[in-house]
Amino acid sequence: IPGQYSLQQNFPNPFNPSTEIRFDLPSDGYVNLEVYNLTGQKVKTLESRNMQPGFHSVIWDGTNHDGEKVSTGMYFYTIQAGTFYNTKKMLFLK
């Protein structure tokens, strides 16, 4: 079990067609992991549920909440778990 919360840089980055996002949870709790575009609009929710402590990873397939491929560009992914909040950038290239 990890000793602290963390959000790692996605890999690969830049990516196409998909990328892996890893995060660590030292305790169980509700996790919200979301992708946003440069204008701050939510593109997709990757996780929104109670999760157990441990080392986790999620694959984002470069689609929005309607299942459509997103445009080339910079995206942000954010995690909120308890009092932990973090944001990182990733680049989708077609």
Which residues are covered by each model-predicted region?
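C-terminal tail/sorting-segment detector
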Residues: E68-K94
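Short coil/turn motifs at beta-sheet boundaries
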Residues: P14-N16, P53, V70
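Signal that preferentially marks extracellular ectodomain short beta-strand elements
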Residues: V58-V70
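Short, flexible helix-adjacent loops and helix caps
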Residues: S48-M51, H65
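Glycine-centered coil/turn sites that cap beta-strands in beta-rich domains
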Residues: I1-N37, T45-S48, S57-W60, A81
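Extracellular Ig-like/FN3 beta-sandwich strand-entry sites
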Residues: D28-Y30, P53-F55, T72-M74
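Generic structural signal for well-ordered beta-strand positions
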Residues: V43-K44, V70
